[in-house]
Curated annotation (Swiss-Prot):
Its cofactor is Mg(2+). Its main location: membrane. Keywords: Cell cycle, Cell division, Cell inner membrane, Cell membrane, Cell shape, Cell wall biogenesis/degradation, Magnesium, Membrane, Metal-binding, Peptidoglycan synthesis, Transferase, Transmembrane, Transmembrane helix. GO terms for biological process: cell division; cell wall organization; peptidoglycan biosynthetic process; regulation of cell shape. This is Phospho-N-acetylmuramoyl-pentapeptide-transferase. The gene is mraY. One of its GO terms (molecular function) is phospho-N-acetylmuramoyl-pentapeptide-transferase activity. It comes from Saccharophagus degradans (strain 2-40 / ATCC 43961 / DSM 17024). It is a multi-pass membrane protein. PROSITE patterns: MRAY_2. It is an enzyme of class 2 (transferase). It catalyses: UDP-N-acetyl-alpha-D-muramoyl-L-alanyl-gamma-D-glutamyl-meso-2,6-diaminopimeloyl-D-alanyl-D-alanine + di-trans,octa-cis-undecaprenyl phosphate = di-trans,octa-cis-undecaprenyl diphospho-N-acetyl-alpha-D-muramoyl-L-alanyl-D-glutamyl-meso-2,6-diaminopimeloyl-D-alanyl-D-alanine + UMP.
């Protein structure tokens, strides 16, 4: 939004030309989102407390979690507001990739908001019925997948690139829509499953989102992409602003979500952030690298799948409790230890993922 104003004012004051630079707008984006999160956080938490929008805790979960009952939830609305506001302020709103990511963020955020509202306000323990939750997620996922497919301007936009190997790629054709759907819906639910401990989901989200911002900047630059021998996707660099806003909003939220949490993000935050990461990974054509960097989200999801499959087939559980973070809690690990160790794992995976950009 301010980019348009700066372009107009540039003809009178040349200093406004600096606003055109992606790095400058990314810095302003992270500062704007971080500032909004920190400033509005106390007000949001107080408002949620007054409205008695508190988290209910499962009776069959770890006993240490019972003290969390009543902690304000739906704090993801703060994250999404900060991200969307900063993105609208500092990004190029004519860029179709920015619009696609904003659509995914808001649509999945709405699904999560309805689910949270039914649980904590209407006191419906099941929230939004699973079939309807997946229906609306699928509708949004297929919509953005189809939209990106039919508006693709170059073959690189719908090609799957394999890391580590130079020139190894698969033209997906219509299967691009299917891949995009699973990336968006799958990681939306993966982040939601991970969001079970204080700060456990938001910090890996910030780290992976920041790494995707770096990748977006590189693939959106013809010189850098040619040097690194990675796909060049014109316009993808504009997502740096969104990723910066995500990092800022996430860090601001972590200020209040760190152990012991003053607020939880709820489904409104987790579903939206996971879906946003998934669609950005697709746009920048680094799906496999993204899956590597998101190893924590993948492990949490796989642990649930294995647990359910094992119990249905054999009547036995593989883990003491799923998702995986609860397994370690029941083994006696204090919650902060589980959280920080999962963060450390994410740091290593993100660094490895970024290193693959040079490994060919």
């Amino acid at each position: 939004m301010l980019l348009w104003l700066a372009e107009y004012l540039q003809q009178y004051i040349s200093a406004f030309a600096v606003v055109k630079y992606l790095t400058f707008r990314a810095i302003l984006g992270v500062m704007t989102a971080l500032g909004l999160s920190l400033l509005l956080g106390p007000w949001v938490i107080n408002k949620l407390n007054k409205l008695q929008i508190g988290q209910s805790i499962r009776d069959d979960g770890p006993e240490s979690h019972l003290v969390k009952s009543g902690t304000p939830t739906m704090g993801g609305t703060l994250i999404l507001f900060a991200i969307v506001f900063a993105t609208l302020l500092w990004s190029d709103l004519t860029n179709r990739y920015v619009l696609a990511v904003l659509f995914v963020t808001l649509s999945f955020g709405l699904v999560g908001w309805v689910d949270d509202y039914r649980k904590v306000v209407q006191k419906n323990s099941k929230g939004l019925p699973a079939k309807w939750k997946y229906f609306w997620q699928s509708l949004a996922g297929f919509t953005v997948a189809y939209g990106l497919y039919v508006t693709a301007q170059i073959p690189e936009e719908t090609t799957l690139y394999i890391p580590f190997f130079k020139g190894v790629a698969l033209e997906l054709g219509v299967f691009y829509i299917i891949l995009t759907y699973f990336m968006v819906v799958g990681f939306s639910n993966a982040v939601n499953l991970t969001d079970g401990l204080d700060g456990l989901a938001i910090m890996p989200t910030v780290m992976v989102g920041s790494a995707l911002g770096i990748i977006a900047y590189l693939v959106g630059n013809a010189n850098f992409s040619a040097y690194l021998q990675i796909p060049y996707v014109p316009g993808a660099g504009e997502l740096v602003v969104y990723c910066a806003a995500l990092a800022g909003a996430g860090l601001g939220f972590l200020w209040f979500n760190t152990y012991p949490a003053q607020v939880f993000m709820g489904d409104v935050g987790a579903l939206a952030l996971g879906a946003a990461l998934g669609i950005i990974a697709v746009i920048v054509r680094h799906e496999i690298v993204f899956i590597i960097m998101s190893g924590i989200f993948v492990m949490e999801t796989v642990s649930v799948i294995l647990q359910v499959a094992s119990f249905k087939l054999t009547g036995r559980r593989i883990f003491r409790m799923a998702p995986l973070h609860h397994h370690f809690e029941l083994k006696g690990w204090p919650e902060p230890r589980v959280i920080v160790r999962f963060w450390i794992i994410t740091v290593m995976l993100v660094l490895f993922g970024l290193a693959t950009l040079k490994l060919r």
